[in-house]
Each structure stands twice: as structure tokens, then as C-alpha cells.
UniProtKB/Swiss-Prot annotation:
This is Apolipoprotein A-I. The lineage of its organism: Eukaryota, Metazoa, Chordata, Craniata, Vertebrata. The modification Methionine sulfoxide is found at M110. Sequence repeats lie at residues 68-89, 90-111, 112-122, 123-144, 145-166, 167-188, 189-210, 211-232, 233-243, 244-267. GO terms for biological process: adrenal gland development; amyloid-beta formation; blood vessel endothelial cell migration; cellular response to lipoprotein particle stimulus; cholesterol biosynthetic process; cholesterol efflux; cholesterol homeostasis; cholesterol import. It is found in: Secreted. Residues 68-267 are annotated as: 10 X approximate tandem repeats. Homodimer. Interacts with APOA1BP and CLU. Component of a sperm activating protein complex (SPAP), consisting of APOA1, an immunoglobulin heavy chain, an immunoglobulin light chain and albumin. Interacts with NDRG1. Interacts with SCGB3A2. Interacts with NAXE and YJEFN3. It comes from Cebus imitator. Participates in the reverse transport of cholesterol from tissues to the liver for excretion by promoting cholesterol efflux from tissues and by acting as a cofactor for the lecithin cholesterol acyltransferase (LCAT). As part of the SPAP complex, activates spermatozoa motility.
Length: 267
């Protein structure tokens, strides 16, 4: 229970910097590294799920009848996309490094604000943890007689046990909801304070002069433009790699349609 409450605190205050237990000895990731890892996981999941759908279609009766060899084309497409990712790796890394460098001061200020707000809300989180542990203990005490009855065979039907448990479960749910609502109310001012601090930081940047904002905009545009220019060769390679795949799919599809038309005409 304590771990669950601490997890809630970490999620609320630090943006979920928790790692898997086998990664605890690794150096902490930067926010940009986490964003890049998340994007990679998303792309890989889409790629894997897409291949599963293609495989399921080819295994179906219609897929076997058409014989489009979609899985071979999908694997070729995947290889081409993977090559694109490898080619763009250094370019995107440079973009992330530049962006992280330009926004470093703002992240440092916000980290300080987060630590201050975290210190203020910690007593409320500790109080919530204490009350929740008390509720669990109380619920366990109320369940003990029912557990004893059930073990001794006094309750012959599971329905009887469910009828006795339902009021207790509803009571615990209502009390838990009340504690969560109280915690939400207590934390609301600090959430507003954090948003206000961020707005203040941005306002300071704005009031520091139009030249500063224009400079950041120009740098961002420059980085994006450089990313686009450096990505052109890799994108052209992707286009060239896709052409044989698309042509193969086109030929297979037209051949399948022609074969299907012949079967219809012969019937």
C-alpha cells in the first residue's frame, strides 16, 4: 500500500520517472531520452501489430484465395523503414541535443518549482497514506468473521457470502472516494500554483524582449530546417526502396483479380 501511494506521489510530482526494477542501476534518463524511447516503443508496437494483422489476413480463406504475398511485402517495407530510422538517427539526435540545450534554463527553473511544491504537498500525501492504511485495516477486521464462517462451512452458498460482502465493499469504496476527493481538494491550490509559476516563467521570457522570443523562434526554425535538409537523402532512399514493394503488390493484386475473374466466368 505504501508503494502504491508513493507511486501516486511520483506520478504527480515528477512526471513518472519510475523505471523497471532491472533498470535501477542504470543512470537516470533525461526527459528527452524518455520522449524518444516512448516514440520508439510506439512505432515498434504499431509495426508489430500491423504485421500480425497482415499475417491474420493471409491466413484467412480470402487471403489464401487472393495469394497477395502481403507478408513478404510487409517485411520488405519494414526493412526499408528500419534503414530509414538508422540513417536519420544521427540527424534526430542532433536535433534533440540542440532543443535540450536551448530549453535547459526553463527546465532547471521548473525543476526548482517542482521541488518546492513537492515539499508543500508531501504532508497531504502522508496523511492520505495513513488514512488509507487505516481503512484497509478496518476492512480486514470486518472481513475476518466472514472468512471464519466460510472456512467452517457455515455459509453454504457463495451468494450468501456475496450478499454480506457487498455492503462492506460499497462502504470501503465510498470512504476511499471521500479520501481521494479530500486529497484532490487539498492538492488543487498547489496544482494551480505550479501552473501559475510556469505561466510566470513564460511571461518573464516574453517581457525580456521581442528579440529573445524571435531568437528562440529563429533557432527552432533553423534546427527544423536543418533536420529537413539532412533527412532528404534518407527519405529519397525510402522512396526508392518502396517502389519495388509497391510494384510487387500491384502486380500481385492485379494477378489475383484476373484469376478471380476467370473463376467467376467459368462458373
Amino acid at each position: 500500500m505504501k508503494a502504491a501511494v508513493l507511486t501516486l506521489a511520483v506520478l504527480f510530482l515528477t512526471g513518472s520517472q519510475a523505471r523497471h526494477f532491472w533498470q535501477q542501476d542504470e543512470p537516470p534518463q533525461s526527459p528527452w531520452d524518455r520522449v524518444k524511447d516512448l516514440a520508439t516503443v510506439y512505432v515498434d508496437s504499431v509495426k508489430d501489430s500491423g504485421r500480425d494483422y497482415v499475417s491474420q489476413f493471409e491466413s484467412s480463406a480470402l487471403g489464401k484465395q487472393l495469394n497477395l504475398k502481403l507478408l513478404d511485402n510487409w517485411d520488405s517495407l519494414t526493412s526499408t523503414v528500419n534503414k530509414l530510422r538508422e540513417d536519420l538517427g544521427p540527424v534526430t539526435q542532433e536535433f534533440w541535443d540542440n532543443l535540450e540545450k536551448e530549453t535547459g534554463w526553463l527546465r532547471q527553473e521548473m525543476s526548482k518549482d517542482l521541488e518546492e511544491v513537492k515539499a508543500k504537498v508531501q504532508p497531504y500525501l502522508d496523511d492520505f497514506q495513513k488514512k488509507w492504511q487505516e481503512e484497509v485495516k478496518l476492512y480486514s477486521q470486518k472481513l475476518e468473521p466472514l472468512r471464519t464462517e466460510f472456512q467452517e462451512g457455515a455459509l453454504q452458498k457463495l451468494q450468501d457470502l456475496q450478499e454480506k460482502l457487498s455492503p462492506l465493499a460499497e462502504q470501503v469504496r465510498d470512504r476511499a472516494r471521500a479520501h481521494v476527493d479530500t486529497l484532490r481538494t487539498q492538492l488543487a491550490p498547489y496544482s494551480d500554483e505550479l501552473r501559475q509559476r510556469l505561466a510566470t516563467r513564460l511571461e518573464v521570457l516574453k517581457e525580456s524582449g521581442g528579440a529573445s522570443l524571435a531568437e528562440y523562434h529563429a533557432k527552432a526554425s533553423e534546427h527544423l530546417s536543418a533536420l529537413g535538409e539532412k533527412a532528404k537523402p534518407a527519405l529519397e532512399d525510402l522512396r526508392q526502396g518502396l517502389l519495388p514493394v509497391l510494384e510487387s503488390f500491384k502486380v500481385s493484386f492485379l494477378s489475383a483479380l484476373e484469376e478471380y475473374a476467370k473463376k467467376l466466368s467459368s462458373q
